[in-house]
């Protein structure tokens, strides 16, 4: 019988967690890819129309997100031209730290009414399709 104590794993040897993560994984349409310029510099943002519910009649939830992480930013910048050309860009994504933010409609039929936007951080684009054709991120080109 072996009575030696188990070696601590690498994860157990790390510092204790000081932050709790809230992640959302899904599939949706990439829209409004843009660089936002503010006094302290700039950042990249986009919106994602996430699909959920029945495959036959999916519902949509909209997220307005700041793009975090070098790989996610590189992939979104690559997809930007397709979004701007009004092609259908579908992405498998991961969001973090979502929260609601209220706003007032400035124009249109809802002018003056309060709306709610779901904000967050885009952490990852796992895969993408443009007009149904897979994107090869390894080569940063459209797959044939």
Predicted regions and their residues:
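Single-stranded nucleic acid-binding surfaces, predominantly the OB-fold ssDNA-binding core
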Residues: 2-144
């Amino acid at each position: 019988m072996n009575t030696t104590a188990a070696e601590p794993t690498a994860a157990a040897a790390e510092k204790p967690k000081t932050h709790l993560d809230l992640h959302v994984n899904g599939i949706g349409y990439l829209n409004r890819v843009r660089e936002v310029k503010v006094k302290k510099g700039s950042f990249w943002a986009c919106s994602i129309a996430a699909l959920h519910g029945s495959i036959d009649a999916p519902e949509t939830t909209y997220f307005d997100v700041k793009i975090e992480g070098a790989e996610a930013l590189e992939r979104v910048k690559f997809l930007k031209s397709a979004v701007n050309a009004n092609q259908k860009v579908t992405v498998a994504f991961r969001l973090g730290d979502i929260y609601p933010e209220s706003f007032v409609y400035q124009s249109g039929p809802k002018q003056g009414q309060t709306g709610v936007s779901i904000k967050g951080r885009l952490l990852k684009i796992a895969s993408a399709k443009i007009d149904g054709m897979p994107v090869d991120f390894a080569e940063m080109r459209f797959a044939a």
